[in-house]
Each structure stands twice: as structure tokens, then as C-alpha cells.
């Protein structure tokens, strides 16, 4: 028994010694190898590897949390080839591994929200018109601040758009100029806009200076160099791209079937040599001269004749036969191949023309790909499968083509029709990254009216907006809040405001009534107000200005708002009918008093008219129903300059609201019934409400029209000839068969 114990102890000791020798030898060899590498690197002056690189394997899980610069310098691993090391060191962006979590300071945005600071322009620095438009769009936005201490994001005033060294717009010595900025901080929380980078012959994406930890809003950026959740891919746009507004899409009506004269078209340069030449040189294989027109020309550049091939003369001749605009507007699909760079002007041209883009640019990070689902608006092709493009697009069902075409128009008008929209979309994407808890989802970005008009600060629930009831399977609100704007003192029980209050309160759809007291006289006593079945809340305006009627009051508990002037004359039946109509069109303004706009050729300006014509483009908010979200948009989206103008004139607030809603919906308001007179004509002439009789009042409204159109960059108002009346309205049938029979007597 004792012998067995001795043998067991001896065997255990031997095993321990063997294990100790084995692990000790491995560690000794590793340390010797490590010391030799250190000695070798020391002799060659190489960077000493960090001790963190020799942590045990279980530390690999901590890799995502390493500092970005430490990860960036990890080029001394034993498994990295010399070629990989050279490629890493020659990367166009030294901060290639930057992400919002590692290269952005969120603390700057917590205190003052998302504010953007633009550096003051330096004397003697040339700035291209396109970059001036970008800076103007930022400075005119609600994000702009002139105080750098309040800023969350910084934008250079130095022109970084064109970094092609052969371009006359190229800014020299940009590296030293940027480094001298006292707020640069290695680019942290900075945004750099760029359209062109690199030059002949390779057109790399190097912008020519160290961007540090700055974000890039860049055109023609490749997926290889694009830093997800950090950079923003923007479209390539020309110097003639409008600063604000922009033309609407060219799709005026939907044709069924949605096929045009040409199936697939392209007209552009053919590069005979160099980068981007492979695809365009092969387009002639697909061109059939009938419904597939892919036209190229060799006539560009100074030395094109030196490189011309046997096809150039034939291509040049056929190229001149067709008008590009005619092709563009009569084609179902438009080919968008890469050029010298990945992006192309053809991309935006196809979107505007409702020609479905067929992308043929491998490795291009499509514009705003972080939020836009391009599969709903474009066909993503592969340069290597060029010959399969015709058969692929011919196999697309007509229903799908119609949906693609409609989506091109939405995306064009929502995000691409002006420099301002491109810039604001870029800023909104960055803001969503910072405040992820209230960021917009894919449905908002890819469905009308788009991410620029749906402000997540209002609500994180889509059902609180008037645009998504059908998507969510929700019914429109069943109740409304009446908001009566009172500006005259209450001196008689027969005043129109009291009659209006009683009529609105009797509506079966009325939840409450809010009286906004903007009168200079003190509030009347409670017993002066009539008794009603619904609550009546009187709010005394602090500033007593016109814009206060559109403030997003917390007292408004319903989504629907019935906006009323104090001298409006409406019956309960008229209120009920207008509300039932609004339930079918919750995103629009629905009401009674209609007005119109027109273009005055003699004065070359917009005009305003209250004449009774066969069409209208505005429904005044003195007797109208709309969604309360427009109160929030009016207050937080529109610039202070327009609201200050309205307050100073005590006029035009209803016109501005119509501009806003039409700009959002791209639709006209809706007039109900043929009622024309909606004002009480017996109001005292000493009251503020008699401003309608003031001769200057009409002239002011003419001026407002042009000021508003100037800010929007275009005329958003849309004419309509539709009027909605009750079923059987004035038909020769029994009055008992009519639901809104009282309307016929009014």
C-alpha cells in the first residue's frame, strides 16, 4: 500500500515537472523571439510595438474598445505582410477606422443641442459659388449658430469642394491653413464637404490634406474608403445646381403602362484610355439603335485624336443625331455608368426626369445610402455583367417600373433638387446619429414627405404625424380642438365670437375649445363666457403677436385643430361637415375661405387675389381644420425672419401656413361647399379685426407672397379646382335623405 502511494507521488511530480518544462520553454522561446524583434526594430529605427499587442487571446474581445489611433497604428503584427503595411500607411484617410463612437465628442451636443458653426471667411481666400451655396444653406438653417462655444459641429470656410490639383478652383496650402485654425482639434466634430478629389491619371480619393478625425460629406466616395456611421455620401452636383427650391420632377402624370419610347438610354463621353474607360468602351455592345440608345463621343479633352480608335468617327456621328434632353424625357431607364470618378451628373439628371437610374459603378457608396433605400428607386447593376443589363430591365414588371419612377420623383424633390436640401439632409443624418433615441426610421426617410419635414423632436411615434395613418392601419382622429383667435374686447353678449363659440361647442366632434386672448384689454370674467358642454380654456398670449396662434400649445389634446378668427360665421353643421372631410385628408388644410395666387407678368412678381375664380391655392386659417403638427413645424421649422415679419405686420400668418403645408405635402388645400362669405360684416370699425378693410392690408399680403416665395426658393402653392360638397347637395330629392341638410339653407 505504501509502495503504491510512493509510485503515485513520484508519477505526479514527474508530470508536474514535464508541464513546467514545456510551458517554461515555450515562454522562453517567445521572449527570445520577442527580444530579437525588438533588437531588430531598434536597429532599423522602427516603431516599437505596444505591449497591448502581446495580451492573451481572451483580450481580443476588447478590440472594438481600443482608442482609434492605437488601432490605426497596429501595423507590426507578425501576420501582416509588408505590402499590407504599405497599403495601410498610404491610405487616403489616416482616420480610416473613425466612427462616431471613437472620433466624435457627443458632450458638445448635450448642452445646446445640434448647432453648427461656420468659420468666418478669411480675407483673400477664394470660394467657389457651389461652396458659397453650401455655407449659405447652413447659415440660413435652424441649426446655425454664430457662437462656437454653443456648436456641436464645425464647418470650414476654406473651400474644400474641388481637390483636383489641375482645377482652377483648387485651394493651395490647405494643410497649413487648416492646422492653424484654433478650433480644429485634429478635426474632431468637424464636417468637410468635397465633390472632387484626386487628379489624372488615377483620380484617388485623397483630398490633399490630413482630415484627422473630421467627417467627410463626399461625392463619388467608394465603399472601400467610406467609413460607415461616420462619413456621408453626397451626390455630385454641378455649379448650376440651384441653391434653394429647385425645379420639381418632370413626371406630370402617371402613364399606364409606364413604358416610354426608349427602354434604356445614355449619352456621354467615351474614355479611350485610363480609369473608367473599360465600361464606357463596351457600351456599343448593348446599343441597338432602336429602344436601347447608348451614345458616346471621343471628342473631349485636348489629345483625343491621338488616342482615337476605329469606332470614334462612327460614334461621334451617331452621337450628334440625338438630343440628350429628348432622350432623357422619353426613356424608361437611364444608364448611369461611372466616369473618371465613381459619381456622375447623369445620376441627378435621371432622377429629375423620372427616368429610372441603372447604376453601373461598382464600389460606389450611393448618396445618403445610410437612410435611403435605393432598391426602391434604381436598378443596381454590375459593370462585369454589362451585357445582361438589357434582359434584366426588360424582365422588370410594369407595376415595379411605375413604383420605381414614382420613388425617383419623391427622392428628387425631398433631398436632391437644391444645394440646400443636400446640405440639410447631410446635417439631419448626422443629427440622427447623435440623438439615436429620437432618430428617424427608414419609413420616414423613404416615404412622403421625407425626413426633412418630419421632425423627430415632435414625437417618436409615427401615429402622431398625419402622413402614416394608412401605413400603421390607424383611423384619423375622431375629435378636434377649436382654437379661436380673439383680438377685440368682450363688450356685448351678441358678439360674433360668442356665437361662434356656441356653434363649435355643439359639434359632436368637438373635444374642447381654446380661446387665445390676444387683446390689449384684460380677460373678461368667467360668467361672461357662455355655458358649453365641452371645456373652454382661455389662454392669454404673452407677446400678443399673430404667430402666437400657431404655437404648439400643450393644451391642445387632439391631433385635429379647428382654427377660427373671432369674427368667423359658421354653423354647427358646417363645422361637422368640414371635419368629416378633413378625416379623409388629414395631411391637408380643409376649410371655407379660399384665395388664389398668380404671376403678374407686367411686374414680374407674384400676386394675391381674393376674387371668386374657378380655382384656388389657399384656404385661410380663419375657418379651417388641419393637423396640430403644423403648429410645431410653423414654430420650429420656419426661420425667425419670416415669423418676425408676420408679427410686425400683424398680417400674412395664414398665407405663411398655406405655404408651409403645401411645401410639405406637394398638394393643394381643400375647399368645402360653395360658401364665399365667412366673416361677420357688422364688426365695429374700431376693432383690430377691421384690418381686412384697411387698404394697406391687401398690399402687405402681396408683399408677403413674394417674400415667402423667395425664402422657399420656389412657389409651393398649387392651384386646385376641386370643391367638396355633401352628398346630394342641392339635388332634387327629399330633404330627409340629406345628412347635412342645413348647409343648403346657408
Curated annotation (Swiss-Prot):
It is found in: Golgi apparatus membrane; Golgi apparatus, cis-Golgi network membrane; Endoplasmic reticulum membrane. GO terms for biological process: antigen processing and presentation; axon guidance; basement membrane organization; blood vessel remodeling; BMP signaling pathway; bone resorption; canonical Wnt signaling pathway; cartilage development involved in endochondral bone morphogenesis. Pfam families: Exostosin_GT47, Glyco_transf_64. InterPro entries: Exostosin, Exostosin_GT47, GT64_dom, Nucleotide-diphossugar_trans. The keyword Transport does not apply. A protein binds at residues 166, 203, 300. One of its GO terms (cellular component) is catalytic complex. It is a single-pass type II membrane protein. Glycans are attached at residues 89, 330. Pathway: Protein modification; protein glycosylation. Residues 1-5 are cytoplasmic. Its main location: Golgi. N-glycosylated. Its EC number is 2.4.1.225. UDP binds at residues 267, 269, 271, 280, 319, 324, 346, 349. Belongs to the glycosyltransferase 47 family. Part of the heparan sulfate polymerase, a dimeric complex composed of EXT1 and EXT2. Could also form homooligomeric complexes. Interacts with NDST1. This is Exostosin-1. The gene is EXT1.
Amino acid at each position: 500500500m505504501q509502495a503504491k502511494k510512493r509510485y503515485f507521488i513520484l508519477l505526479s511530480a514527474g508530470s508536474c515537472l514535464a508541464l513546467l518544462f514545456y510551458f517554461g520553454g515555450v515562454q522562453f522561446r517567445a521572449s527570445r523571439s520577442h527580444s530579437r524583434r525588438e533588437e531588430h526594430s531598434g536597429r532599423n529605427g522602427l516603431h516599437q510595438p505596444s505591449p497591448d499587442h502581446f495580451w492573451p487571446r481572451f483580450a481580443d474581445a476588447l478590440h472594438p474598445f481600443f482608442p482609434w489611433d492605437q488601432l490605426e497604428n497596429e501595423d507590426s503584427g507578425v501576420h501582416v505582410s509588408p505590402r499590407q503595411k504599405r497599403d495601410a500607411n498610404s491610405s487616403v484617410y489616416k482616420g480610416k477606422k473613425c466612427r462616431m463612437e471613437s472620433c466624435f465628442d457627443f458632450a458638445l451636443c448635450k448642452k445646446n443641442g445640434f448647432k453648427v458653426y461656420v468659420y468666418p471667411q478669411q480675407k483673400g481666400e477664394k470660394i467657389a459659388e457651389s461652396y458659397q451655396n453650401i455655407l449659405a444653406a447652413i447659415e440660413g438653417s435652424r441649426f446655425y449658430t454664430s457662437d462656437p462655444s454653443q456648436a456641436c459641429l464645425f464647418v470650414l470656410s476654406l473651400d474644400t469642394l474641388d481637390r483636383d490639383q489641375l482645377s482652377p478652383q483648387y485651394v493651395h496650402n490647405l494643410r497649413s491653413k487648416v492646422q492653424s485654425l484654433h478650433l480644429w482639434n485634429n478635426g474632431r466634430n468637424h464636417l468637410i464637404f468635397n465633390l472632387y478629389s484626386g487628379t489624372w491619371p488615377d483620380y484617388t480619393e485623397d483630398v490633399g490634406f490630413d482630415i484627422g478625425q473630421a467627417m467627410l460629406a463626399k461625392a463619388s466616395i467608394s465603399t472601400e474608403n467610406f467609413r460607415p456611421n461616420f462619413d456621408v455620401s453626397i451626390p455630385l452636383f454641378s455649379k448650376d445646381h440651384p441653391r434653394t427650391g429647385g425645379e420639381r420632377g418632370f413626371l406630370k402624370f402617371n402613364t399606364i403602362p409606364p413604358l416610354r419610347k426608349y427602354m434604356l438610354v445614355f449619352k456621354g463621353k467615351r474614355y479611350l484610355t485610363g480609369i473608367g474607360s473599360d465600361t464606357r468602351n463596351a457600351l456599343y455592345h448593348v446599343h441597338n439603335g432602336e429602344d436601347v440608345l447608348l451614345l458616346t463621343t471621343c471628342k473631349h479633352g485636348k489629345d483625343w485624336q491621338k488616342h482615337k480608335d476605329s469606332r470614334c468617327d462612327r460614334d461621334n456621328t451617331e452621337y450628334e443625331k440625338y438630343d440628350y434632353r429628348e432622350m432623357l424625357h422619353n426613356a424608361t431607364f437611364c444608364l448611369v455608368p461611372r466616369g473618371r470618378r465613381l459619381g456622375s451628373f447623369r445620376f441627378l439628371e435621371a432622377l429629375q426626369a423620372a427616368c429610372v437610374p441603372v447604376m453601373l459603378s461598382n464600389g460606389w457608396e450611393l448618396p445618403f445610402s445610410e437612410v435611403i433605400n435605393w432598391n426602391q428607386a434604381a436598378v443596381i447593376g454590375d459593370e462585369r455583367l454589362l451585357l445582361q443589363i438589357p434582359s434584366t430591365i426588360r424582365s422588370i414588371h410594369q407595376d415595379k417600373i411605375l413604383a420605381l419612377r414614382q420613388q425617383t420623383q419623391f427622392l428628387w424633390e425631398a433631398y436632391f433638387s437644391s444645394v440646400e436640401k443636400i446640405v440639410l439632409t447631410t446635417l439631419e443624418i448626422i443629427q440622427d446619429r447623435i440623438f439615436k433615441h429620437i432618430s428617424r426610421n427608414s419609413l420616414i426617410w423613404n416615404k412622403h414627405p421625407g425626413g426633412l419635414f418630419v421632425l423627430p423632436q415632435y414625437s417618436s411615434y409615427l401615429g402622431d404625424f398625419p402622413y402614416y395613418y394608412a401605413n400603421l392601419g390607424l383611423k384619423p382622429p375622431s375629435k378636434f380642438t377649436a382654437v379661436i383667435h380673439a383680438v377685440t374686447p368682450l363688450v356685448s353678449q351678441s358678439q360674433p365670437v360668442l356665437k361662434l363659440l356656441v356653434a363649435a361647442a355643439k359639434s359632436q366632434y368637438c373635444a374642447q375649445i381654446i380661446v387665445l386672448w390676444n387683446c390689449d384689454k384684460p380677460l373678461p370674467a368667467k360668467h361672461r363666457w357662455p355655458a358649453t358642454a365641452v371645456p373652454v380654456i382661455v389662454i392669454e398670449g404673452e407677446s400678443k403677436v399673430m404667430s402666437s396662434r400657431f404655437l404648439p400649445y400643450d393644451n391642445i389634446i387632439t391631433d385635429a385643430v379647428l382654427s377660427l378668427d373671432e369674427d368667423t360665421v359658421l354653423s354647427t353643421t358646417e363645422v361637422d361637415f368640414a371635419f368629416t372631410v378633413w378625416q379623409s385628408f388629414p395631411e391637408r388644410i380643409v376649410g371655407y375661405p379660399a384665395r388664389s395666387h398668380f404671376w403678374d407678368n407686367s411686374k414680374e412678381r407674384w400676386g394675391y387675389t381674393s376674387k371668386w375664380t374657378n380655382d384656388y391655392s389657399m384656404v385661410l386659417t380663419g375657418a379651417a381644420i388641419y393637423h396640430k403638427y403644423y403648429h410645431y413645424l410653423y414654430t420650429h421649422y420656419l426661420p425667425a425672419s419670416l415669423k418676425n415679419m408676420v408679427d410686425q405686420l400683424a398680417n400674412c400668418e395664414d398665407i405663411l401656413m398655406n405655404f408651409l403645408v403645401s411645401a410639405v405635402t406637394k398638394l393643394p388645400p381643400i375647399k368645402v361647399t360653395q360658401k364665399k362669405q365667412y366673416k361677420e360684416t357688422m364688426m365695429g370699425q374700431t376693432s383690430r379685426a377691421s384690418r381686412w378693410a384697411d387698404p394697406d392690408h391687401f398690399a402687405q399680403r402681396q408683399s408677403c407672397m413674394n417674400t415667402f416665395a423667395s425664402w422657399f426658393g420656389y412657389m409651393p402653392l398649387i392651384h386646385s379646382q376641386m370643391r367638396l360638397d355633401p352628398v346630394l347637395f342641392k339635388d332634387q330629392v327629399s330633404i330627409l335623405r340629406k345628412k347635412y341638410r342645413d348647409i343648403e339653407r346657408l
